[in-house]
């Protein structure tokens, strides 16, 4: 596939090449017709299921059969002028482009003795209706999420962001999948270096199939060995719009209801778009609550193991006696029972996700209660540990970014093992190693710990806490945006 579409005298050879290239599938339709008032033969080619077949027969085939072409020397331009009132039209001259158009759901018109094919946009596959986001449900905010159609997702963004400087930069990726990938940004806000870097990384992708944004994320992230996400996954259009307005970029993939937002910094994982819908005090307190939840999710089980196994003297006397009494008869050391309960919680959580929704919720709640109660009654674990694991699980659920909850769940086991080996000293060493890793991590070249280190104190009022809207007049300084002002100074 690389030659010109040669139709010098035999239209049937080209149709045979198309059938051979596609494997003569049952859904391939090739309708041969003669142009009205002429002996010139042509063929209408499309794939059923990807194309609106009724409209093809109603408008395309009927036009070819019943509307005469007066100037056969300019037949391609004449047909283009006629079909432009029906749909988006174009022309292609190479065989690979013809095949790609057919596979994309377009209708191709081949004309005998003409080296140019007419392409008509007639894509009409089934689409999921707009629904609320599944993974980012909010109390207050829009009730619509992205879906699998990239054009619908673009519409959702444009509908709420009517800015002439909004840019959609498209790519076709995947040697076999031929998926549309779109880079979205606001031209007069975003730092050009971010656009240039993302464009370079996207154009460097070489792969057979692109199925979802996760494929793109893994191919363009800064550090492939880090458990921390370097792009923010979201299915909320308002989250995308808020990020674009800050000076960030978004990546859409056709067939995926999720978008990627870059760059991502560590403080972003504790933020929710809902923070901007509530008063500043509530938004700030919610952020601090999520930060505390992150600490609990990672450190609470490890602290239990360290205190019970190594540093009993740091536990208040009454609490120490209670824990000792509860652990009486438990056959396993603290780290074994902690790892068992943590693994059990992960199994329950995973089962709840994979099972049908009503059954999954039941398994998650009832399964945790039943297994915890049975384990305590059997003397396998103590009640204090059940409470600790339950609080840890609840803390992970309070984090707004699902991908970071997976990271924190992995870190939980790392810190438990460190506490098992060296007690509190192991936890401190693990924290130092984690801090070193995070400070060396970047997202599209932006340090992951920004705006804390390097310090951009001016950004703390928006990124670290959430000050009143009247005080938020500038975009994040660490993004080095073209237009740094959100609210122009009021005239006196």
Curated annotation (Swiss-Prot):
Biological process terms in GO annotation: spore germination
Main location, first listed in the record: membrane
GO CC aspect terms: membrane
Membrane topology: Multi-pass membrane protein
Top-level taxon of the source organism: Bacteria
Disulfide bonds: none
Keywords linked to the UniProt accession: Germination, Membrane, Transmembrane, Transmembrane helix
Job of this protein: Contributes to the L-alanine germination response.
UniProt similarity note: Belongs to the GerABKA family.
Protein name: Spore germination protein GerLA
Lineage: Bacteria, Bacillati, Bacillota, Bacilli, Bacillales
Gene that encodes the chain: gerLA
């Amino acid at each position: 596939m690389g030659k010109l579409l040669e139709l010098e005298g035999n239209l049937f050879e080209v149709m045979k090449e198309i059938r051979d290239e596609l494997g003569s599938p049952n859904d391939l339709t090739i309708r041969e017709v003669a142009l009205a008032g002429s002996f010139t033969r042509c063929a209408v080619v499309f794939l059923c299921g990807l194309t609106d077949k009724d409209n093809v027969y109603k408008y395309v085939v009927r036009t070819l059969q019943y509307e005469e072409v007066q100037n056969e020397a300019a037949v391609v331009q004449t047909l283009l002028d006629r079909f432009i009132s029906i749909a988006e039209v174009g022309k292609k001259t190479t065989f690979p482009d013809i095949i790609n158009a057919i596979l994309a759901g377009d209708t191709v018109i081949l004309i005998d003795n003409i080296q140019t094919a007419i392409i008509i946009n007639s894509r009409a596959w089934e689409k999921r209706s707009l629904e609320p986001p599944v993974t980012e449900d909010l109390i207050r905010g829009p009730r619509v999420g992205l879906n699998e159609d990239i054009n619908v997702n673009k519409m959702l963004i444009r509908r709420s962001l009517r800015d002439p400087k909004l840019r959609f930069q498209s790519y076709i990726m995947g040697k076999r999948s031929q998926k549309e990938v779109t880079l979205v940004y606001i031209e007069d806000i975003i730092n050009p270096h971010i656009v240039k870097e993302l464009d370079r990384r996207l154009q460097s992708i070489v792969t057979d199939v692109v199925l979802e944004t996760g494929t793109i994320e893994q191919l363009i992230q800064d550090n492939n060995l880090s458990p921390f996400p370097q792009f923010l996954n979201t299915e909320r259009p308002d989250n995308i719009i808020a990020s674009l307005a800050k000076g960030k970029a978004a990546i859409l993939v056709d067939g995926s209801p999720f978008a990627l937002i870059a760059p991502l910094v560590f403080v972003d994982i504790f933020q929710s778009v809902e923070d901007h819908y509530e008063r500043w005090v509530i938004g700030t307190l919610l952020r601090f609550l999520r930060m505390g939840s992150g600490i609990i999710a990672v450190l609470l089980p490890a602290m239990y193991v360290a205190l019970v196994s190594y540093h009993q003297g740091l536990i208040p006397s009454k609490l120490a006696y209670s824990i000792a009494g509860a652990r009486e008869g438990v056959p396993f050391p603290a780290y074994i029972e902690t790892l068992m309960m943590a693994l059990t919680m992960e199994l329950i959580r995973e089962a709840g996700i994979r099972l049908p929704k009503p059954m999954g919720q039941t398994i998650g709640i009832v399964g945790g209660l039943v297994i915890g109660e049975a384990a305590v009654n059997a003397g396998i674990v103590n009640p204090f540990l059940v409470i600790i694991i339950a609080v840890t699980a609840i803390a992970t659920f309070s984090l707004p970014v699902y991908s970071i909850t997976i990271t924190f769940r992995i870190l939980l086991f790392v810190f438990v093992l460190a506490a098992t080996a060296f007690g509190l000293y192991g936890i401190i060493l693990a924290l130092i190693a984690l801090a070193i890793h995070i400070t060396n991590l970047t997202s599209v070249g932006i340090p992951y710990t920004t705006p804390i280190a390097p310090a951009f104190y001016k950004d703390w009022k928006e990124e670290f806490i959430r000050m009143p809207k009247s005080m938020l007049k500038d975009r994040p300084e660490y993004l080095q945006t073209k237009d740094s002002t959100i609210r122009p100074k009021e005239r006196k």
